[in-house]
């Protein structure tokens, strides 16, 4: 009935619901993922055995499902409700890996690209950021050329993550998508050395700087120039390429508490170390490394000195002999500034090799054309990733990304900006930046009734003493039975509690937000919606925000009656001349004759 004039009060109530309803809110696992992968969707499909369907959802966002299933820092898991409530998140990465191993075939990859636009884009670096930018731009029909100084795909992911965690054939298989899509990659070409940065600007319509942080950082402690001191970057790169590091000794100290430090420590066993130690300012409880990496390092025999900071490197005749540690009392001062304080208690650990896993920086390949911060990142607009140089964008490590999934999202963000540049659009106008990176979910609902803690499952690992002496893959991954069981732990987080209680609203919309948004925009309502409500109020009872949906439905009925000449718009309504309230009078009540039996 398009001739109904509804009261403003109904519109106001509806608008309040539209503004706050969480029915369309994505779960925290999805919003925490910088690529916004539909975690809940593919976990459900995997649990049902629909591996192809699950993989389809994954590959809509991620071209590296097997890789990420092994090495992703999985912010989705950190924000999983089972983690925030029980400290045991769903093993999202493990499920992703299994699905990809079971169902991913290059014959099924989406190779559609747009018509040739005549635009050319140069991308520096074939890591996750550069690759993602290349994929997004190539799909739009642009000619894309990647310049990679290494001879292989993967960037820092390839030379910084040991192969016992990430087999190289996995990288090669998943990166072959770029070749099939028509992206050109020129290996062994270093921008700033083999080709000048300005030459790229002159030849290409846009440039993406996506080269990783390949420069290691060594803290200038007393003795840091002694023979036997190396950066983690140098060490892991050579070990990755050769499975060896001849300059290292047999007793290794790794300085640092992150995943890179764990990789250095565990790699040291695999190239022949007899003793491997770790030290860091952070205590064992506050190490930045993932718990999996810490646990597996401990299993392999790494000796931790967490909470003990290095104060000097001892040497004899210029070669490392030991590292002196002091007990850490605090790392930051009262203002939150980095200012370590030590107790007098010391430890001296005899070693012949020291590895600094204390950070790395991005080399400037622009000859100063693009400003860099003191931390070795390029200065860019954080939302658009545009640099101060027109047509030049930055992604990945070079713009501040810290993990692979973030690098991919930044590569996509740079591609979005370039697409706008090519279309002549402003880089920021009418752009929903929230959809381009991680954000906090609006979903705030109670746990489903009867929810209990269910232990998280883990893949089978090789024996620690066996695995620590070779580079074969450590984690065998999940079985089909484990995937089914682990998927069943998902709480399927969503609101829509009212939709589960109401017997009629599902016939008219997906959730109150979409239902009432349509009402506000069209200024119209299906009378069946208003007259189907039986005023049970269960929608409001279960609503986390106590929204009065019933008030709108019941409140709309007088407006329908008024527009219909004083009669109900519903055929079949009959008068019941009794003492009921108005809400149950002839205008609002359906009546049917008794069925003769």
How does the language model describe each region?
Residues 9-11, 20, 295-301, 309-319, ...:
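Mid-to-C-terminal Rossmann-like scaffold of FAD/NAD(P)H-dependent oxidoreductases
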Residues 27-31, 40-221, 509-597:
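Iron-sulfur-cluster electron-transfer modules
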Residues 90, 161-185, 224-232, 289-315, ...:
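N-terminal glycine-rich dinucleotide-binding loop that anchors FAD/FMN and/or NAD(P) in oxidoreductases
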Residues 99-115, 173-193, 216-271, 373-388:
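Glycine-rich dinucleotide-binding loop and its adjacent helix/turn
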Residues 142-148, 273-280:
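Short beta-strand "acidic-cap" motif of Rossmann-like dinucleotide-binding folds
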Residues 189-205, 315-346:
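Conserved beta-strand-loop-beta-strand element in the redox core of flavoprotein oxidoreductases
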Residues 225-250, 333-402, 409, 416:
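FAD-site-proximal beta/loop scaffold in flavoenzymes
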Residues 264-279, 405-430:
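Internal hydrophobic alpha-helix adjacent to the cofactor/substrate pocket in enzyme cavities
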């Amino acid at each position: 009935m398009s001739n109904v004039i509804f009261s403003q009060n109904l519109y106001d109530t509806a608008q309040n619901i539209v503004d706050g309803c969480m029915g369309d809110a994505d779960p925290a696992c999805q919003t925490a993922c910088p690529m916004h992968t539909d975690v809940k969707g593919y976990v459900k499909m995997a649990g049902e055995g629909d591996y192809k369907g699950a993989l389809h959802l994954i590959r809509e966002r991620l071209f590296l499902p097997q890789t990420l299933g092994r090495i992703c820092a999985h912010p989705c898991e950190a924000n999983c409700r089972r983690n925030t409530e029980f400290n045991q998140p769903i093993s999202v990465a493990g499920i992703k890996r299994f699905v990809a191993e079971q169902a991913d075939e290059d014959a099924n990859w989406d190779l559609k690209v747009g018509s040739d636009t005549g635009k050319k884009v140069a991308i520096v670096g074939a890591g996750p950021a550069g690759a993602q930018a290349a994929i997004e731009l190539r799909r739009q029909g642009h000619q894309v050329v990647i310049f990679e100084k290494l001879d292989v795909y993967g960037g820092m992911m390839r030379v910084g993550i040991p192969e016992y965690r990430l087999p190289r054939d996995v990288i090669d298989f998943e990166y072959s998508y770029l070749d099939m899509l028509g992206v050109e990659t020129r290996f062994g070409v270093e921008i700033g050395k083999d080709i000048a940065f300005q030459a790229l600007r002159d030849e290409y319509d846009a440039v993406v700087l996506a080269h990783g942080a390949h420069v290691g950082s060594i803290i200038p402690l007393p003795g840091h120039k002694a023979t036997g001191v190396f950066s983690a970057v140098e060490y892991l790169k050579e070990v990755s390429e050769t499975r060896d590091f001849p300059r290292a000794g047999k007793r290794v100290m790794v300085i640092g508490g992150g995943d890179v430090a764990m990789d250095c420590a565990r790699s040291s066993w695999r190239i022949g170390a007899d003793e491997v130690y770790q030290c860091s300012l952070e205590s064992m409880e506050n190490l930045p490394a993932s718990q999996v990496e810490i646990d597996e390092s401990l299993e392999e025999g790494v000796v931790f000195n967490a909470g003990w900071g290095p104060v000097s490197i001892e040497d004899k005749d210029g070669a490392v002999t030991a590292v002196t540690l002091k007990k850490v009392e605090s790392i930051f001062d009262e203002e939150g500034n980095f200012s370590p304080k030590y107790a007098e208690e010391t430890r001296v650990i005899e070693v012949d090799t020291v590895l600094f896993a204390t950070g790395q920086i991005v080399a400037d390949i622009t000859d100063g054309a693009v400003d860099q911060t003191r931390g070795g990142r390029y200065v860019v607009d954080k939302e658009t990733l545009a640099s101060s140089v027109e047509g030049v964008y930055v992604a990945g490590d070079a713009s501040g990304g810290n993990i692979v999934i973030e690098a991919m999202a930044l590569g996509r963000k740079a591609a979005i900006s370039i697409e706008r540049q090519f279309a002549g659009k402003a880089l920021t106008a009418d752009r929903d930046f929230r959809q381009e990176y991680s954000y906090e979910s609006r979903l705030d609902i109670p746990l489903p009734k009867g929810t209990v803690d269910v232990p998280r499952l883990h893949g089978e690992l090789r024996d620690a003493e066996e695995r620590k002496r070779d580079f074969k893959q450590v984690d065998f991954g999940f079985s089909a039975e484990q995937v089914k069981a682990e998927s069943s732990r998902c709480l399927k987080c969503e609101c829509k509690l009212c939709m589960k209680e109401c017997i009629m609203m599902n016939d008219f919309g997906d959730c109150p937000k979409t239902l009432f948004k349509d009402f506000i925009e069209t200024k119209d309502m299906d009378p069946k919606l208003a007259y189907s409500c039986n005023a049970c109020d269960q929608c409001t009872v279960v609503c986390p925000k106590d929204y009065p949906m019933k008030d709108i439905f019941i409140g709309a009925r007088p407006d329908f009656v008024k527009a219909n000449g004083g009669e109900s718009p519903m055929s079949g309504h009959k008068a019941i001349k009794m003492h009921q309230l108005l809400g149950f009078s002839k205008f609002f009540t359906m009546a049917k004759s008794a069925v003769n039996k």
